From Swiss-Prot:
Record keywords: Calcium, Disulfide bond, Glycoprotein, Hydrolase, Metal-binding, Metalloprotease, Protease, Secreted, Signal, Toxin, Zinc, Zymogen
Record-stated family: Belongs to the venom metalloproteinase (M12B) family. P-III subfamily. P-IIIa sub-subfamily.
Top enzyme category: hydrolase
Bridged cysteine pairs (disulfide): 316-395, 356-379, 358-363, 411-440, 422-435, 424-430, 434-462, 449-469, 456-488, 481-493, 500-550, 515-558, 528-538, 545-581, 575-586
Organism name: Naja atra (Chinese cobra)
Entry's cofactor comment: Binds 1 zinc ion per subunit.
UniProt-annotated binding residues for Ca(2+) 1: 208, 292, 395, 398
Subunit and interaction comment: Monomer.
Protein's name according to its UniProt entry: Zinc metalloproteinase-disintegrin-like kaouthiagin-like
Residue positions of motif D/ECD-tripeptide: 455-457
Length: 593
């Protein structure tokens, strides 16, 4: 009876293979659900690394599965994402300029790679779960959290599985009227560089990058400055890694949001707006904030299919080291590709021809694109080197340094000056839990700075040596929670019932045990875990650690939550007295962690 009912419900939930879900990046028609598990960092001798006095760690590792195979994602914080004299500017309704220097070095933006894969790379935001992309076995995968409360579930998908908002290719507005012939390029490449030229090419380059968000884009995101800042940070973190093969480091030196009105008329004609922006940078921006290059992110719809425009070979020029980019798609990877493309033009790189290739494609400097781009072609790298030797731009040779502050100390101006231990702004604006905004001194040790939010969390106390609240501490894994209904696991209290409720709604609960016995079959519909691409049936004691079954309250059914591969019981879920799920098996809680 149960098996027959299961078939009927599966047909209702999966009318065709490939379920669809709306994620932050758009509508995804095929995806895999994974549960990334953080791997504790160990010092020599197997002792766990002590928690740093920062909100985010410098290095992290996460383990999860891709196509049923385990992978380990190594992450390292992009410490050079922000210049040390990074500032943020917005405008009051009356037009007053408001510039601050917020503490941004303890951020959550990472680069990384997949363990044991030499050519892999990753760009990840770890602010709230894992969001970004990584390369695995020659293919690019995107990852982002599923919006399920108290769950570590993430979706992994490929670009081809995202339904495009618009199938029309994005186009760069740069017109190619001065291309050299293939023959002349070949002749140029045959010259032998002098030792001085080789040294110049090998020197690491630094671009202090300034981003302006226009008023249309500000209003499009409902005047939400924090959301806009996160979007820009994620974009520049992605841009940064694209320029690594060119030995260029992109450091964000400033972010400006035109929150009251545009500072010049932003027009649909991209060439006109680019010219106006270059003049504004030269006459207004540079006198008050140094930068090597500035880009305008705009909410305007440029004429035709144009989404960006830039000057070619113009870096370090006061009125031409600029580009404009339309924020045309909710997917950060697409807009970041356009930012990279236009900056490539500033660095002397033209559009790729049909003979230019890169792996994986598409190439960054293609004139038309419908997918994110991650690599410069060999043609682009050659043109960049030729531009460097021809123009010798000097502004990109200086490593970003902090600006000395010599003015009298003022508590509340965001600058840590002589006699101050911290400065988080005014008492009304301060967001630093362990800095006394009135005195600009650290709060005393044992001052509670973060309360425990539930059974599986612990309160945090200031150290007296830092303005930041220590890293969020969690109750140990295996600690009883929710009146012994389950055990803590990585800060959550996972139960089968709560998993059904979050996936299907408050009118659902966990199915009776008879449904879970189906997991002993090990077929496409019911299993415990994957090993080498094979679905392994559950042992009798493990059935509640395999595929999840739910039912409407006051009914007896075996409903599978919607997902192409089903939803599995979350790691750490209670499967018996003193027992928890771990890798598809029901094990003793005392030995599970």
């Amino acid at each position: 009876m149960i098996q027959a009912l299961l078939v009927i419900i599966c047909l209702a939930v999966f009318p065709h293979q490939g379920s669809s879900i709306i994620l932050e990046s758009g509508n995804v028609n095929d995806y895999e659900v994974v549960y990334p598990q953080k791997v504790p960092a160990l010092l020599k001798g197997g002792v766990q690394n002590p928690q740093p006095e920062t909100k985010y760690e410098d290095t992290m590792r996460y383990e999860f599965q891709v196509n049923g195979e385990p992978v380990v994602l190594h992450l390292e914080r992009n410490k050079g994402l922000f210049s040390e004299d990074y500032t943020e500017t917005h405008y009051a309704p009356d037009g007053r300029e408001i510039t601050t220097s917020p503490p941004v070095q303890d951020h959550c933006y990472y680069h990384g790679y997949i363990q044991n894969e030499a050519d892999s790379s990753a760009v990840i935001s770890a602010c709230d779960g894992l969001k970004g992309h990584f390369e695995h076995q020659g293919e690019t995968y995107f990852i982002e959290p599923l919006k399920i409360s108290n769950s570590e579930a993430h979706a992994i998908y490929k670009d081809e599985n995202v339904e495009n908002e618009d199938e029309t290719p994005e186009i760069c507005g740069v017109t190619e009227t001065t291309w050299e012939s293939d023959e002349s390029i070949e002749k140029t490449s045959q010259f032998t560089n002098t030792p001085e030229q080789d040294r110049y090419l090998q020197d690491k380059k630094y671009i202090e990058f300034y981003v302006i968000v226009d008023n249309r884009m500000y209003r499009y995101y409902n005047n939400d400055k924090p959301a806009i800042k996160i979007r820009v940070y994620e974009m520049i973190n992605a841009v940064n890694t694209k320029f690594r093969p060119l030995k260029i480091h992109i450091a964000l030196i400033g972010l400006e949001i035109w929150s009251n009105k545009d500072k010049f008329e932003v027009k649909p004609a991209a060439s006109v707006t680019l010219k106006s922006f270059g003049e504004w940078r030269e006459t207004v921006l540079l006198p008050r904030k140094r930068n090597d290059n500035a880009q305008l992110l705009t909410g305007i719809d440029f004429n035709g299919n144009t989404v960006g425009r830039a000057y070619i070979g113009s870096l370090c020029k006061t009125n031409e080291s600029v580009a404009i980019v339309q924020d045309y798609n909710r997917r950060i990877s697409l807009v970041a590709s356009t930012i990279t493309h236009e900056l490539g033009h500033n660095l002397g790189i033209h559009h790729d021809k049909a003979s230019c290739i890169c792996i994986p494609g598409p190439c960054i400097m293609l004139k038309k694109r419908t997918a994110p781009a991650f690599q410069f072609s060999s043609c682009s790298i050659r043109e960049y080197r030729e531009y460097l030797l021809r123009d010798r731009p000097q502004c990109i040779l200086n490593k970003p340094l902090s600006t000395d502050i010599v003015s009298p100390p003022i508590c509340g101006n965001y600058f840590v000056e002589v006699g101050e231990e911290c400065d988080c702004g005014s008492p009304q604006a301060c967001q630093s839990a362990c800095c006394n905004a009135a005195t600009c001194q650290f709060k005393g040790a044992e001052t509670e700075c973060r309360v425990a939010k539930d059974d599986c969390d612990l309160p945090e106390l200031c150290t007296g040596q830092s303005a930041e609240c220590p890293t969020d501490s969690l109750q140990r894994n295996g600690h009883p929670c929710q009146n012994n209904q389950s055990y803590c696991y990585n800060g959550t209290c996972p139960t089968l019932t709560n998993q059904c409720i979050t996936l299907l709604g408050p009118h659902f609960t966990v199915s009776p045990k008879g449904c879970f016995d189906l997991n002993m079959r090990g077929d496409d519909g019911s299993f415990c875990r994957m090993e080498d691409g094979t679905k392994i049936p559950c042992a009798a004691k493990d059935v509640k650690c395999g595929r999840l079954y739910c039912t409407e309250k006051n009914t007896m059914s075996c409903l599978i939550p919607p997902n192409p591969d089903g939803i599995m019981a979350e790691p750490g879920t209670k499967c018996g007295d003193g027992m928890v799920c771990s890798k598809g098996q029901c094990v003793d809680v005392q030995t599970a962690y």
